[in-house]
Amino acid sequence: LAQSTRHPGQPLRVLIVADTFPPDINGASRFTERLAGGLVRNGNNVHIIAPATSKAWGTFTEIQDGVEMTVHRIRSYPLVIHKTLRFVNPLTLKNKVDLILDEFEPDAIHSQSHLSVGRVLARSGRERGIRLIATNHTMPENLLKYLHLPKFLEKRVKAKLWKDAGKVLSKYDQITTPTRRAAELLEAAAGIENVLAISCGIDATKFTNSTKTTNNPFRVLFLGRLDWEKHVHNLLKAAAKLPKEIDFFIEIAGDGSQKKYLADLARELKISTRVKFLGHISEEELPLAYERATVFAMPSIAELQSIATMEAMASGRPVIAANAMALPHLVHHGDNGYLFEPDDVDDFSACLLKVATADQKELNRLSENSIHLIQSHDIKRTLSIFEGLYRGDQDARQNSDDNSEDYMKPIGRLSIVVRRAELKVRRQALAALGKITDLGDEIKDGLEEIGQDVKRQAKKVDKQVRTGVKKTVGKAKKAIKRLDE
């Protein structure tokens, strides 16, 4: 990356480009909003280019993430195949983008998607010598379901979509993605190199609470888009398999194409009275939803990180998640929750049961480990890395702390060596206890024998005493009689 003309500490001019932005509610949208908000709070000048979600398009001053920022809303049209994706006319897009670039003159462009607006910005930004950063939040697998392609075409189309992603992203100076697992996938599937793993980050203080995790009642929360790849239907099926004595409730926050299907499924499974669909919830309601929950569930099979899961962890809640994509990066099996095999409803249900029947000590342990793990995802660190990339600082080209080797080490479970040693000590203790028990029986028998001897001796002494007393009394009487005479 070229060195910036602005010195460290000087405000940056950053243009963030996104295909999804609030009021859209999804992980990419929320990250973009919080990234922009954090940059503004750090004193930088931030503009956003994003599709308009209504008939009002143009340039607006909007309050996002609690701060003012300039948002350029591009005229767009809803896609029939997907509830949240929107189509922007590529024939008119470049002219609009070029006008914004010439007027704003950004130090860096940070694209959050290569599909639409980010595709055009790559070309326009390169023409002007602007530093280009791209963060990938997209998996082609998530799009295939909505194309309704024949099975035999899916593999071929998926390969073409990945190739297209590589073609667009390779025009950027630096590519990032939220986790090391997602970076490895992007490098292998799209044919690009040196992808940085930088966590989306989170301001954990927004979700801190003093409420202990409790499973009485047992409350499960899911928050996210209600679309196919989230596999929320597996949550309902797994909950329906819980023993009848488990008094469970499920709260589902979010909206999407699967909402009606999920409501129908809950009725079919005869658990509709235990399932509540919250719809979209406000930023003020969000921490309260996590605080109410016993456990957060994320059954999705296509998460490149999952901001909702990080929010649950920051709230001190255990997490049960599918053992797929980047979720094992957040959920350390047995430490702060449990992983189940994707689409294995029985395994999912067994994980739910573990938390539902855990004692308070175990719930506290899981909760504390969630809080411990989320500390590596501090958004201040994320902002610092990106600001360095915007300036062209070579030292900024590094992964975030959660992608270090130490982060993945177990924290709540013992290593195999230590566990074996502990088992050996337990066995020795049990053996010693057995010997003590045997010895105790011998002592008991001995004491009983002593007790019987004591009783016999006591009777003998009593007899002797009584006889002695009688003799003494008799002698005393004779002595008194002699005195009287």
Describe each region flagged by the PLM.
Residues A52, R181, G201:
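Carbohydrate-associated surface elements
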Residues P318-A321:
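Short hydrophobic beta-strand element within catalytic cores of glycosyltransferases
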Residues H333-G334, Y338-V345, K354-Q360:
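Conserved acidic donor-binding segment of nucleotide-sugar-dependent glycosyltransferases
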Residues D347, K361-S376, G388:
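A short, well-ordered alpha-helix in the C-terminal region of glycosyltransferases
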